[in-house]
Structures are given as structure tokens and as C-alpha cells.
Amino acid sequence: MELFKFEPLLKQTIWGGSKIVTFKHLQSDLDNVGESWEISGVPGDESVVANGEWKGKTLNEVLAEMKDKLVGADNYQRFGNRFPLLIKFIDARQDLSIQVHPDDEIAHKQGKPMGKTEMWYVMDSDEGASLKVGLKKKITPEEYARMVDDDTICDALGNYQVKSGDCFFIPAGRIHAICSGSFIAEIQQTSDVTYRIYDYKRKDKDGNFRQLHTKEAAEAIDYTVLDDYRTDYTPVKNEATLLVSCPLFTTAVYDLTEPMTLDYSELDSFVILIAVKGEGSILTSSGDTYTFREGESVLLPATTDIVKVEGNIKFLETFV
């Protein structure tokens, strides 16, 4: 059995910082790197395999040949040749825009192929860093439009001081924003549909205001108010700790100080492992050993049965 590693796919943004290049141990002088697309099947931004017999092939080319052997029978029937998840690292040197993503139904009505549900795992944060998630008070669509116009929409949003290990589930329709000083891993549907609600009246490098999608967002927003949007969980060493389980993905975190065997023989899905701290190795049932250290994301095909992870390493595990 072979696991897949991928070439870096870095995105420079007006709000990006310098953490990603260091975190991924890259030799690069790029600045303002806001995102690393770790595993992507988004057309035009497809990950390229960096190892083994598939080296140089895109993820979508591998999927077209391997089909259900890569993603699992149910997933292949459900998603076809569209890889279902997009994995990112995000480094916010400045605040990102206030935004929302549509669900699949609304996305289809607005001419988009798929909506977007996602989750955030905070890998690191500067002192005072925060995330904006969800509505903290009830507002109507009319009040929403007024608050965007008079620059008070942030007053309606939950604001969370964050630290390493914090987790937030962001289903389609939930308003959110990543704020300066946050360094996160993002797991999401394979979609790049974002409706920008508010951007602090900032201008791009050409002196233009960035496009807003206030009207489209109004239709997509879920106006439900929750008491707390932070995921409540208690991490346990050397065990799987569930973070999120929804129809689109299931994610757990592992914090290992001793070897652990992961049995996927009954799972009809690919598995992605995302190293967020430390280093170790992955041993497959066929006897192959792969290095695995922070900043790396690896894809295990659905044919994987058992792997052993060794080392002092914290990583996320996600599958569909």
C-alpha cells in the first residue's frame, strides 16, 4: 500500500504572513503566504503527487484511474471524480473578511457546483488572537443589511480569544472570520465558494475595494443563534479524540507519545492525516515507512488496512 504526499501549493494574499513557509520546512522567500492548499482537487488548483509511482500526477488524475480504490465505493458513487475534501493551512497576519458559504442547495440555485461546510483547528495563535464565529444576537435579514452598510456587523458576531487546540465547526450558512494572529488547519468541502460580507473598507494593491457579495450572502446566512460555537472536547493522550462528525467529514485529533496502530480495514473511505505538531513516522502493512512531521498532510487510499504511527506527534485524522 502506498500513501500520497503532495507538492506545496502556496497562496499569497494581502492578509497572509510568514508562518506557513517555516511550518512546512520550505526553502522559499515568498512573503504574505496566507494559505497552503495541502490536498486539493479544485480545478485549476489541483495538488500534484510528490512521491512514489504516481509522482507528477494531479490528485484528479489519480482519482480518475483509481476511482473507488482511492476514495471508497460509497464516496465514489456519491461524488464521482470530484475529490470530496479540501485541506488548507491558513496564516492570518491581518484580519480576513467577514464571510459566509452557501449550502449545496443554495449554491446550485446560484449557479455554483457545491456549497461549503468546514471546520477550523487552531494550531497556534499570537497573544490576543481571535476568531469570529456565528451570530451572538438575533438579527433579521433587514438588520443584517443595515449593519453591513453602517459598519456595525461585527457587533452581531461571536468573538473568541483562541489558543492552540481550539476547534470550531463552521457549517454552511454560519458567518465567520479568521482574525489576525490565528494559524489554523481548515478541513472543508471541495468548494471555493465564498460570499464576502464585509472587508473593513480595505483596498487591494491596486487601490480598489474588494468585491462584496452582500445580497448573495443574505440568502445563504443561517440566522440561528447559539450560546457557544466553540467545540467542547477533552483531549486524551494516545487516543482518538473526536472533534467533528457530520455527513461531509469526520475529524479526530491524536496526541501521541507512544506508537499507535490505526485500523482502517472496515472503513470505506480514504483517510487524510495532518501533522500539526512534532514529528514521527508512518509504517504501512506492506512494510513501507514514511516520515511524518508537522506541516505535512498525507492521503491514505481507501484500500488501506492498518498503519502504525510512531513518534511524539500531534495530528488530525479526517475521512468521509
Task: Give, region by region, the residue ranges found by the protein language model.
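Transition-metal
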Residues: 1-139, 199-227, 251
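His/acidic/aromatic-lined binding-pocket segments of jelly-roll/cupin-type domains
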Residues: 87-88, 96, 118-121, 159-160, ...
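Short, basic/aromatic beta-hairpin or loop at an interaction surface
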Residues: 138-150, 268-279
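Short acidic-glycine-tyrosine-enriched beta hairpin
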Residues: 157-169, 284-304
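Short beta-strand segments in beta-sandwich/barrel cores
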Residues: 261-262, 278-283, 297
